[in-house]
Amino acid sequence: MGESKQEHLIVGVSPFNPRFTPEWLSSAFQWGAERFNTVDVLHPGEISMSLLTSTGTPLGRAKRKVRQQCNRDMRNVEHALEISGIKLGRGKPVLISDYLQTQSYQCRRRSVIAEFQNNQIFQDACRAMSRAACQSRLRVTNVNIEPDIETAVKYIFDELPAYTHCSDLFEYETAALGYPTEWPIGKLIESGLTSLERDPNSSFIVIDFEKELIDD
């Protein structure tokens, strides 16, 4: 896939994650440019607020912190582009929150929620992943509370349509969403244990600078 350079790489960036430094992003952009026609960036934007509110941050403060973090991440992306000399295919990062209210995205999000309500395996996986994310956040903030998992899972509801239909979101014929680690919910979808499916024109890869491209 990457060797033919016929597809587009979309680098997923997570807020509040120290991995996504300008140096790491620069390496990811260069890595992608060697394997794909274009490189782009996908960022959650304001939907990451649910992670903060589910771990005790008041709504008003959560909004401010998310805006600040998003701006910080965008500066890191710009710095990484300067270091690498790469230009994004879409010209600028794409924020999931900018597309959340579109008809197609809302339709796919409703499908995710319906799966959560009707599939115990999917529900358990979403809750487990959300709890792990909350616990990681609580360790960073040194707060000892029980996280609100029902709020936290909304982050997955908001993100998943971008995972399953990244090519459509970016208006590319084909595209691969790249991230430095596997995504457990994505692996569950690929297992066939849910009714959710990934668009055949969209794929997921693990970005690993030391190994060959890993494609699931």
From Swiss-Prot:
Protein EC: 2.3.2.22
Domain of life: Bacteria
Enzyme class: transferase
GO molecular function, one term: aminoacyltransferase activity
TM region(s), chain numbering: none
Site (Could have a critical role in the catalytic mechanism) residue list: N17, E159
UniProt keyword Transferase present: yes
Reaction(s) the record says it catalyses: 2 L-leucyl-tRNA(Leu) = cyclo(L-leucyl-L-leucyl) + 2 tRNA(Leu) + 2 H(+)
Residues where substrate binds: N17, Y155, I156, F157, D158, E159, Y179
Active site (catalytic residues): S14 (nucleophile)
Keywords, alphabetical: Transferase
InterPro entries the UniProt entry points to: CDPS, CDPS_sf
Pfam hit, one: CDPS
Residues marked Could be involved in aa-tRNA binding (site): K65, R75, Y155
Record function comment: It uses activated amino acids in the form of aminoacyl-tRNAs (aa-tRNAs) as substrates to catalyze the ATP-independent formation of cyclodipeptides which are intermediates in diketopiperazine (DKP) biosynthetic pathways. Catalyzes the formation of cyclo(L-Leu-L-Leu) (cLL) from L-leucyl-tRNA(Leu). Can incorporate various nonpolar residues, such as L-leucine and L-methionine, into cyclodipeptides.
Family the entry assigns: Belongs to the CDPS family.
Protein name as annotated: Cyclo(L-leucyl-L-leucyl) synthase
Upper lineage: Bacteria, Bacillati, Actinomycetota, Actinomycetes, Mycobacteriales
